[in-house]
């Protein structure tokens, strides 16, 4: 058995008699270790882990370091063939094998549906909360003997998104029954098309109890560890005249770029950009912030244009950089240099990335997802961190960024707020 913390051992003991479990452990509490050990205890000959693309190598290395059975990267066709050779072998002669594949690729491998008598482990199971997504539909078609779900934010506080996960755990409650028992909602008439609005939740104690009965373990960091203090700094950035003009007219020219907000989505997009890479005040403030510290710094960003501006500042200051986004995952400078700047795109790096060698995060621009925002905080504030953690939010005054952060702090996706509450863009931001 792995050398586990007491609370991790307790989670395994609490679910020792179950073959369908969910470990909803707060970010940084070692879900990887708990999940892999549960998989080992279940003892299925064939095992499949589905995770984010950026986590495949981490999972492969974890199994190779701590266990004796083969672990294959199924995003590689050659290793996929080796995996199936091992499947044939262990089914005949015994033993164990595990394959690891990312969500985006799994549903493009229909042969995985032929697996039987296997353990299915979903890392960041919150990624199957959209029941109409191809990844979710594919996973729900699978026939695992055992299920292990891992997530720090299973639904980001939105219980209606639990359906697919609780069905995998064996709680076969009908969707309409779930909504009627646990969700307060109503329909708005949207020009003849009914729009479902969630008002809140009810009977949540009963819901949590039922989830416990079906193998769910919930655990927060502050229940088991005393982590260092978190200190937040909101750095006010002057908005530009271009932003103000765009708010009034919905059109503006910045350099060679003409921005036209001809609908709600494009207007929101360009307002965000005008608060980011188009705002020289923010770029200048970011430069000053980097100059004020020689420690490692993590910078979260949204758009490629922001990445270029951040890289330019780092180049000017002669700061080594590592980049984590959908195109690359290079942490060499982060690992080798004490003054490295790690530039992280939210979707690619806010989940499952351990950056605790740093104790400083800069939010160049905010995400729209409260889940990504919550996960990003834990990249440095996690088990093993010994230093006080500092967070810097670069917020353009009287702008969309203030509204976004207000929503995120309340646990609301900003896109949901726009569509469900019909935000008037002409309202003051104060």
Language-model region placement:
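Conserved pre-motif I regulatory segment
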Residues: 1-24
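Walker A/P-loop
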Residues: 18-38
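Conserved Walker A/P-loop ATP-binding site and its immediately adjacent core
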Residues: 34, 44-65, 157-161, 303-304
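Conserved P-loop NTPase motor "coupling/switch" region that bridges the ATPase
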Residues: 45-46, 81, 119, 127, ...
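Conserved helix-turn-beta segment of the N-terminal RecA-like "Helicase ATP-binding" lobe
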Residues: 55-79, 169-173
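Conserved helicase ATPase core of P-loop NTP-dependent helicases/translocases
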Residues: 83-87, 300, 308-349
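Conserved helicase/translocase motor-coupling segment
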Residues: 222-316
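A conserved SF2-helicase RecA2
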Residues: 368-430
